[in-house]
């Protein structure tokens, strides 16, 4: 939205309009979903003024009111589904990972959480007819897990039919079996994966703001951002806030971070995929003692919760633990050199 239209809001003159744009509030919708405290801190306006601006933007953008269930259903038709390319898992998820939602994948070390994020960074770039969303990925890396070589493995692991179609769409000459051709295709895929390493929790929160800017800048491009991965969501928070005395502060920061991620998903029709670490509950005498980190804050904010569990050799059990519209259940996949594959 052009800057001069922001000046139609009460209390917004040329100077305030510039401040709002510099802080990332470039549209009525972006303003409407902000909080007065957030706008006051980032755009350097008074909290009372921020409240008036936000309320006016909500009226102008028709955000924040009631709507019928039929209208919600119609709006949900715009939501995309990112396929795992594993029929059993896709069926479990009702088609794949949803845009405008947070999907949490948790599990112990070596369960395959980072494998999922890498595979989705490949799959999201596939056209819809092949289960993708035809978009780019953002990868916030807090554990130094991103490996371009793994993207190469997974790209080469696609069916030749899909690779041939990708070569044609991206105007790359050659065949799926040619190394130079596949290297050119890999370079093309890596160009649409935006990676940033998070050095601590504050930096990770800042990267969420940068991800929002990146999604905004690319929303009208040939590859809009359709996937935001955070691997892992909780590693820095867990390391920096130790003991019960710091628990409240940790949860407050984590809550804000999650809502920042959720806002990106809502504003730019992006799927948000986060991985989470686990801990063992010593008080559990029956069943699996493995519990995800993050407490109720993360449990309530994640739209879909998935538990990855090791099985024999390369087999992994994928369990859907929580979803608003789907029954709990399990599926099986294998972690191969060529990527995530069906049983």
Swiss-Prot record:
It comes from the Archaea. The keyword Nucleotide-binding applies. The keyword Metal-binding does not apply. This is DNA repair and recombination protein RadA. NCBIfam families: PRK04301.1, recomb_radA. It holds the Pfam family Rad51. Gene3D superfamilies: 5' to 3' exonuclease, C-terminal subdomain, P-loop containing nucleotide triphosphate hydrolases. GO terms for biological process: DNA recombination; DNA repair. Involved in DNA repair and in homologous recombination. Binds and assemble on single-stranded DNA to form a nucleoprotein filament. Hydrolyzes ATP in a ssDNA-dependent manner and promotes DNA strand exchange between homologous DNA molecules. The lineage of its organism: Archaea, Methanobacteriati, Methanobacteriota, Stenosarchaea group, Halobacteria. It comes from Haloquadratum walsbyi (strain DSM 16790 / HBSQ001). Keywords: ATP-binding, DNA damage, DNA recombination, DNA-binding, Nucleotide-binding. Belongs to the eukaryotic RecA-like protein family. PANTHER family: MEIOTIC RECOMBINATION PROTEIN DMC1_LIM15 HOMOLOG, RECA/RAD51/RADA DNA STRAND-PAIRING FAMILY MEMBER. ATP binds at residues 107-114. One of its GO terms (molecular function) is ATP binding.
């Amino acid at each position: 939205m052009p800057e001069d239209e922001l000046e139609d809001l009460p209390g917004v003159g040329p100077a305030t309009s510039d401040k709002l744009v510099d802080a990332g509030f470039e549209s009525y919708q972006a303003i409407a979903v902000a909080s007065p405290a957030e706008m006051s801190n980032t755009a350097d306006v008074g909290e009372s003024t921020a409240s008036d601006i936000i309320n006016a933007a909500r009226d102008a953008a028709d955000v924040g009111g009631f709507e019928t269930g039929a209208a919600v259903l119609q709006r949900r038709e715009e939501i995309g589904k990112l396929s795992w390319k594993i029929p059993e898992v896709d069926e479990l998820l009702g088609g794949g990972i949803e845009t405008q939602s947070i999907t949490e994948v948790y599990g112990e070390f070596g369960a395959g959480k980072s494998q999922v994020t890498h595979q989705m960074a490949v799959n999201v770039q596939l056209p819809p007819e092949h289960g993708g969303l035809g978009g780019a990925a953002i990868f916030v890396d807090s554990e130094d897990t991103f490996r371009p070589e793994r993207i190469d493995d997974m790209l080469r692991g696609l069916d030749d039919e899909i690779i041939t179609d990708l070569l044609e769409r991206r105007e790359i000459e050659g065949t799926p079996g040619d190394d130079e051709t596949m290297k050119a295709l890999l370079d093309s895929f890596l160009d649409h994966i935006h990676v940033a390493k998070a050095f601590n929790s504050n930096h990770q929160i800042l990267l969420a703001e940068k991800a929002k800017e990146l999604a905004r800048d690319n929303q009208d491009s040939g590859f809009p951002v359709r996937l935001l991965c955070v691997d892992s969501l909780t590693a820095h928070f867990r390391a920096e806030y130790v003991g019960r005395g710091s628990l409240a502060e940790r949860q407050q920061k984590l809550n804000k971070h999650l809502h920042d991620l959720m806002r990106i998903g809502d504003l730019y029709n992006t799927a948000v995929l986060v991985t989470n670490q686990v801990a063992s509950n010593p008080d559990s005498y029956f069943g699996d003692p493995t519990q995800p980190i993050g407490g109720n804050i993360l449990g309530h904010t994640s739209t879909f919760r998935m538990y990855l569990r090791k099985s024999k050799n390369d087999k992994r059990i994928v369990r859907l633990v929580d979803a608003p519209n789907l029954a709990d259940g399990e599926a099986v996949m294998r972690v191969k050199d060529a990527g995530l594959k069906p049983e």
